[in-house]
Amino acid sequence: MEKKISIAIDGPAAAGKSTVAKRLAEALSYVYIDTGAMYRALTYCALQRGVDVHNEKQLMNVLHDTYIELKPSPSGQLVFANGENVTEAIRTNDVTNNVSYVAKHPAVREEMVKRQRELGQHGGVVMDGRDIGTHVLPHAEVKIFLLASVEERAKRRHEENVLRGIPSDFEQLKEEIARRDQIDSERAVAPLKKAEDAIEIDTTSLSIDEVVDRIMCIVQERVEG
Protein backbone atom coordinates (compact mmCIF):
# COMPACT_ATOMS: atom_id res chain seq x y z
CA MET A 1 0.00 0.00 0.00
CA GLU A 2 1.66 3.22 -1.18
CA LYS A 3 -0.77 5.92 -0.07
CA LYS A 4 -0.62 6.80 3.65
CA ILE A 5 -4.02 7.58 5.09
CA SER A 6 -5.45 8.44 8.51
CA ILE A 7 -7.55 5.86 10.35
CA ALA A 8 -9.82 6.90 13.22
CA ILE A 9 -11.11 4.26 15.63
CA ASP A 10 -13.71 5.34 18.17
CA GLY A 11 -15.94 3.59 20.65
CA PRO A 12 -16.81 3.27 24.33
CA ALA A 13 -14.52 2.01 27.11
CA ALA A 14 -13.13 -1.52 26.64
CA ALA A 15 -14.64 -2.02 23.17
CA GLY A 16 -11.27 -3.27 21.89
CA LYS A 17 -10.09 -0.01 20.30
CA SER A 18 -6.48 -0.09 21.47
CA THR A 19 -5.91 -3.77 20.70
CA VAL A 20 -7.39 -3.43 17.21
CA ALA A 21 -5.62 -0.12 16.50
CA LYS A 22 -2.23 -1.53 17.53
CA ARG A 23 -2.67 -4.56 15.28
CA LEU A 24 -3.74 -2.38 12.34
CA ALA A 25 -0.80 -0.01 12.78
CA GLU A 26 1.57 -2.96 12.92
CA ALA A 27 0.10 -4.56 9.78
CA LEU A 28 0.22 -1.28 7.85
CA SER A 29 3.54 -0.03 9.29
CA TYR A 30 1.64 3.04 10.51
CA VAL A 31 2.12 5.03 13.72
CA TYR A 32 -0.29 4.10 16.50
CA ILE A 33 -1.59 6.97 18.65
CA ASP A 34 -3.54 6.06 21.78
CA THR A 35 -5.29 9.32 22.68
CA GLY A 36 -6.84 7.72 25.76
CA ALA A 37 -3.33 7.16 27.14
CA MET A 38 -2.73 10.91 26.88
CA TYR A 39 -5.77 11.66 29.06
CA ARG A 40 -4.73 8.87 31.42
CA ALA A 41 -1.23 10.34 31.71
CA LEU A 42 -2.70 13.72 32.65
CA THR A 43 -5.06 12.05 35.14
CA TYR A 44 -2.14 10.18 36.70
CA CYS A 45 -0.06 13.35 37.04
CA ALA A 46 -3.01 15.26 38.52
CA LEU A 47 -3.68 12.52 41.09
CA GLN A 48 0.02 12.38 41.97
CA ARG A 49 -0.09 16.10 42.71
CA GLY A 50 -3.32 15.83 44.70
CA VAL A 51 -5.19 17.97 42.16
CA ASP A 52 -9.01 17.88 42.13
CA VAL A 53 -10.06 16.19 38.85
CA HIS A 54 -13.18 18.40 38.79
CA ASN A 55 -11.12 21.63 38.84
CA GLU A 56 -10.43 22.63 35.24
CA LYS A 57 -8.01 25.45 36.08
CA GLN A 58 -5.82 23.23 38.26
CA LEU A 59 -5.86 20.49 35.62
CA MET A 60 -4.79 22.96 32.93
CA ASN A 61 -1.83 24.01 35.10
CA VAL A 62 -0.81 20.35 35.33
CA LEU A 63 -1.30 19.84 31.57
CA HIS A 64 0.82 22.88 30.65
CA ASP A 65 3.57 21.52 32.92
CA THR A 66 3.36 18.01 31.46
CA TYR A 67 5.11 16.81 28.29
CA ILE A 68 3.39 13.59 27.20
CA GLU A 69 5.22 11.28 24.80
CA LEU A 70 3.98 8.12 23.08
CA LYS A 71 6.87 5.89 21.99
CA PRO A 72 6.63 2.63 20.03
CA SER A 73 8.44 -0.41 21.45
CA PRO A 74 8.56 -4.15 20.59
CA SER A 75 6.17 -4.83 23.49
CA GLY A 76 3.73 -2.09 22.48
CA GLN A 77 3.36 1.64 22.99
CA LEU A 78 5.18 3.22 25.93
CA VAL A 79 3.78 6.33 27.60
CA PHE A 80 6.01 8.95 29.20
CA ALA A 81 5.09 12.01 31.26
CA ASN A 82 7.97 14.47 31.68
CA GLY A 83 10.42 11.66 30.99
CA GLU A 84 8.87 9.19 33.47
CA ASN A 85 7.64 5.88 32.05
CA VAL A 86 4.00 5.78 33.21
CA THR A 87 2.82 2.99 30.87
CA GLU A 88 1.71 0.71 33.72
CA ALA A 89 0.86 3.45 36.23
CA ILE A 90 -1.86 4.92 33.99
CA ARG A 91 -3.77 1.59 33.90
CA THR A 92 -4.58 1.44 37.63
CA ASN A 93 -8.19 1.49 38.84
CA ASP A 94 -7.64 4.93 40.39
CA VAL A 95 -6.73 6.44 37.01
CA THR A 96 -9.44 4.47 35.18
CA ASN A 97 -12.14 5.72 37.56
CA ASN A 98 -11.12 9.38 37.20
CA VAL A 99 -10.09 9.79 33.55
CA SER A 100 -13.62 10.52 32.27
CA TYR A 101 -13.92 13.45 34.69
CA VAL A 102 -10.61 14.87 33.46
CA ALA A 103 -11.55 14.38 29.79
CA LYS A 104 -14.88 16.21 30.07
CA HIS A 105 -13.29 19.64 30.73
CA PRO A 106 -13.50 21.82 27.56
CA ALA A 107 -10.09 23.50 28.02
CA VAL A 108 -8.39 20.14 28.63
CA ARG A 109 -9.94 18.65 25.49
CA GLU A 110 -9.04 21.69 23.40
CA GLU A 111 -5.36 21.43 24.34
CA MET A 112 -5.29 17.64 23.94
CA VAL A 113 -6.99 17.79 20.53
CA LYS A 114 -4.42 20.35 19.39
CA ARG A 115 -1.59 18.00 20.42
CA GLN A 116 -3.31 14.99 18.82
CA ARG A 117 -3.90 16.78 15.51
CA GLU A 118 -0.21 17.68 15.37
CA LEU A 119 0.66 14.01 15.81
CA GLY A 120 -1.72 12.93 13.04
CA GLN A 121 -1.30 15.72 10.50
CA HIS A 122 0.89 13.81 8.02
CA GLY A 123 -1.22 10.65 7.69
CA GLY A 124 0.07 7.13 8.12
CA VAL A 125 -1.55 6.99 11.56
CA VAL A 126 -4.06 4.84 13.39
CA MET A 127 -5.58 6.92 16.18
CA ASP A 128 -8.07 5.62 18.72
CA GLY A 129 -10.21 7.35 21.30
CA ARG A 130 -13.72 8.67 21.92
CA ASP A 131 -13.94 11.60 19.48
CA ILE A 132 -11.32 10.96 16.79
CA GLY A 133 -13.64 10.67 13.78
CA THR A 134 -15.95 13.47 14.91
CA HIS A 135 -13.51 15.98 16.35
CA VAL A 136 -9.77 15.19 16.25
CA LEU A 137 -9.45 13.84 12.68
CA PRO A 138 -12.79 14.72 11.04
CA HIS A 139 -11.23 14.26 7.58
CA ALA A 140 -9.78 10.78 8.26
CA GLU A 141 -10.15 8.54 5.21
CA VAL A 142 -11.30 5.58 7.32
CA LYS A 143 -13.50 5.95 10.39
CA ILE A 144 -14.48 2.95 12.48
CA PHE A 145 -16.83 2.87 15.48
CA LEU A 146 -16.42 -0.24 17.63
CA LEU A 147 -19.21 -1.45 19.88
CA ALA A 148 -19.65 -4.32 22.36
CA SER A 149 -22.09 -5.11 25.15
CA VAL A 150 -21.32 -3.84 28.68
CA GLU A 151 -21.10 -7.48 29.81
CA GLU A 152 -18.52 -8.34 27.14
CA ARG A 153 -16.50 -5.18 27.76
CA ALA A 154 -16.41 -5.83 31.52
CA LYS A 155 -15.25 -9.40 30.82
CA ARG A 156 -12.42 -8.14 28.61
CA ARG A 157 -11.32 -5.49 31.11
CA HIS A 158 -11.45 -8.06 33.93
CA GLU A 159 -9.22 -10.47 31.97
CA GLU A 160 -6.85 -7.61 31.12
CA ASN A 161 -6.62 -6.61 34.80
CA VAL A 162 -5.93 -10.19 35.88
CA LEU A 163 -3.12 -10.46 33.31
CA ARG A 164 -1.62 -7.20 34.58
CA GLY A 165 -1.90 -8.32 38.20
CA ILE A 166 -4.40 -5.55 39.00
CA PRO A 167 -7.16 -6.36 41.56
CA SER A 168 -10.41 -6.81 39.64
CA ASP A 169 -14.10 -7.27 40.45
CA PHE A 170 -16.29 -8.23 37.46
CA GLU A 171 -19.58 -6.81 38.79
CA GLN A 172 -17.90 -3.58 39.84
CA LEU A 173 -16.34 -3.29 36.38
CA LYS A 174 -19.77 -3.58 34.76
CA GLU A 175 -21.01 -0.67 36.88
CA GLU A 176 -17.92 1.43 36.19
CA ILE A 177 -18.08 0.86 32.42
CA ALA A 178 -21.78 1.77 32.32
CA ARG A 179 -20.99 4.93 34.32
CA ARG A 180 -18.13 5.87 31.98
CA ASP A 181 -20.43 5.38 28.98
CA GLN A 182 -22.86 7.85 30.51
CA ILE A 183 -20.19 10.45 31.35
CA ASP A 184 -18.53 10.16 27.92
CA SER A 185 -21.85 10.35 26.03
CA GLU A 186 -23.29 13.26 27.99
CA ARG A 187 -20.30 15.60 28.25
CA ALA A 188 -20.82 19.03 26.69
CA VAL A 189 -17.66 19.05 24.55
CA ALA A 190 -17.00 16.37 21.91
CA PRO A 191 -19.21 13.66 23.45
CA LEU A 192 -18.79 10.01 22.51
CA LYS A 193 -20.80 9.50 19.35
CA LYS A 194 -20.41 7.81 16.01
CA ALA A 195 -19.34 10.02 13.10
CA GLU A 196 -21.93 10.08 10.32
CA ASP A 197 -19.47 8.53 7.86
CA ALA A 198 -18.05 5.95 10.30
CA ILE A 199 -18.51 2.21 9.79
CA GLU A 200 -19.93 0.52 12.88
CA ILE A 201 -18.61 -2.89 13.94
CA ASP A 202 -20.11 -4.79 16.88
CA THR A 203 -17.20 -6.76 18.34
CA THR A 204 -19.21 -8.64 21.00
CA SER A 205 -19.02 -11.99 19.23
CA LEU A 206 -15.97 -11.34 17.04
CA SER A 207 -12.33 -12.21 17.67
CA ILE A 208 -9.65 -9.53 17.37
CA ASP A 209 -8.43 -11.19 14.15
CA GLU A 210 -11.92 -10.98 12.63
CA VAL A 211 -12.26 -7.29 13.51
CA VAL A 212 -8.80 -6.46 12.15
CA ASP A 213 -9.49 -8.39 8.92
CA ARG A 214 -12.72 -6.46 8.36
CA ILE A 215 -11.03 -3.11 8.85
CA MET A 216 -8.06 -4.10 6.65
CA CYS A 217 -10.51 -4.78 3.81
CA ILE A 218 -12.04 -1.32 4.28
CA VAL A 219 -8.58 0.31 4.35
CA GLN A 220 -7.56 -1.56 1.18
CA GLU A 221 -10.65 -0.24 -0.62
CA ARG A 222 -9.97 3.37 0.44
CA VAL A 223 -6.28 3.23 -0.45
CA GLU A 224 -6.91 1.72 -3.87
CA GLY A 225 -9.96 3.88 -4.52
From Swiss-Prot:
Its main location: cytoplasm. GO terms for cellular component: cytosol. The keyword Cell division does not apply. Keywords: ATP-binding, Cytoplasm, Kinase, Nucleotide-binding, Transferase. GO terms for biological process: nucleobase-containing small molecule interconversion; pyrimidine nucleotide metabolic process. ATP binds at G11, P12, A13, A14, A15, G16, K17, S18, T19. Disulfide bonds: none annotated. GO terms for molecular function: ATP binding; CMP kinase activity; dCMP kinase activity. Its EC number is 2.7.4.25. It catalyses: CMP + ATP = CDP + ADP; dCMP + ATP = dCDP + ADP. It comes from the Bacteria. InterPro entries: Cytidylate_kin (IPR003136), Cytidylate_kinase_dom (IPR011994), P-loop_NTPase (IPR027417). It is an enzyme of class 2 (transferase). It is found in: Cytoplasm. Belongs to the cytidylate kinase family. Type 1 subfamily. NCBIfam families: cmk. This is Cytidylate kinase.
